[in-house]
Amino acid sequence: MFKNSKKKITLGISVQKFESKPNNWKTLIYQRHTITIEELVNLICEGHCICQNFKTASKTFGLREKTIANFDFADCIVLDIDDTFLSMNDFYLSLKDEHKPTIIYTTYSNIDNINNRFRLIYVFNEPIRSNEYYRGIANTIVYNIQKEIEGFDLKDKTCLNSSQQFAGNGNDNIVYYYNDNIDVLIFSRYIMAVVYLPNVIN
């Protein structure tokens, strides 16, 4: 990781904001924004949802356009951690510094030490331009977590694809964030070694 407080990333931000997890994801409308990490944290805390960047004809887009086939690029990778045996704080402290996420925040359904649910965002220093590469880096992140947290399993495998969307948390959330950007080479150099592991890919 390296410090860069002026680093900006581009991603889809929902026009709507929510006080609880959206009931109907099909109604969400997104617009592409280029923002700082701190601005992203503020939008998450306001209850906005986020997604990656897609090739669209208009400034706003929805579920129809948000597909793997339309994927344009990603400046970050987002992973859902559901029903893990560690609280968000303990999970974070268990990771080596080079594998810690840029942003980590609890989801709407999190109940500490009962139903631990949170989200990891890894901001990279260069864009990811294919779903295959996105999955490769995401799987490598999971692989490194599994090496450092014995018994960890990524239960929601849908977040390994670039087409996934993620809720913010505008209600009693806990957020850690750092103005650190991760060198994509830290993870990409291991892709060929782990991308075919059956216990990681689903």
Name the predicted role of every residue range.
Residues 1-118, 123-136:
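Signature for HUH/AEP ssDNA processing cores
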Residues 11, 46, 61, 150, ...:
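Feature targets compositionally biased, intrinsically disordered low-complexity regions
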Residues 11-15, 27-30, 35, 175-176, ...:
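Hydrophobic transmembrane signal anchors and adjacent membrane-proximal interface regions, especially
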Residues 60-62, 67-70, 77, 153-156, ...:
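Poly-acidic low-complexity segments
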Residues 89-97, 123-150, 176-196:
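Helical (often loop-to-helix) elements that flank the catalytic cores of nucleotide-handling enzymes
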Residues 103-106, 191-202:
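Long, charged low-complexity interaction segments
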Residues 111-113, 123-128, 153-181:
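Short, conserved secondary-structure transition motifs
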Residues 148-162, 196-202:
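Short secondary-structure transition/capping segments
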